[in-house]
């Protein structure tokens, strides 16, 4: 009876060792697969970061079609050659402020038409910028590009009205740019 027990014990040890080697091999392969998946995910996020960060609606826009007939759609060219769409509603008189409107992510100026109608209802002016890549404007959005767009729009607006009449209105994505712009240029309010 003794030799059989020793043989069974050796067999059990060998089976356990084989199982352990197989388990370790599977774990190594899983770890390697996980590492490869993580690296691919990081690479994908790097390559697609603009698409994950910005959600532009590039559709062309007509202010009259969305209930803002007093707005003129204009085009402004940035120093880096991009064309931006601007909706311009002059103020009722020289005493009224003008809102430089920097919109948020995920839509275009058409989606804000009701808000614009409320802004201009009391005679204030509106200079609403459509970021690069949004609503008829060229290129694709980027942090540096948004700042170029805002500086360009501000520069054109202060050729039309005094800086002390400009109110910066930033919505969501545009609020960050508005704060950064207000740190650089004179405005009536933010």
Feature-to-residue mapping (PLM):
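A conserved short beta-strand
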Residues: 186-190
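Alpha/beta-hydrolase fold nucleophile elbow
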Residues: 161-172
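Extreme N-terminal basic, low-complexity initiation segments
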Residues: 2-11
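Membrane-embedded segments
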Residues: 79, 83-156
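Conserved dinucleotide-binding and phosphotransfer motif residues
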Residues: 122, 160, 184
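An N-terminal hydrophobic leader/cap segment in hydrolases
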Residues: 30-77
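Glycine-rich nucleophile elbow surrounding the catalytic serine of serine-hydrolase chemistry
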Residues: 170-180
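N-terminal Sec-pathway targeting helices
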Residues: 15-37
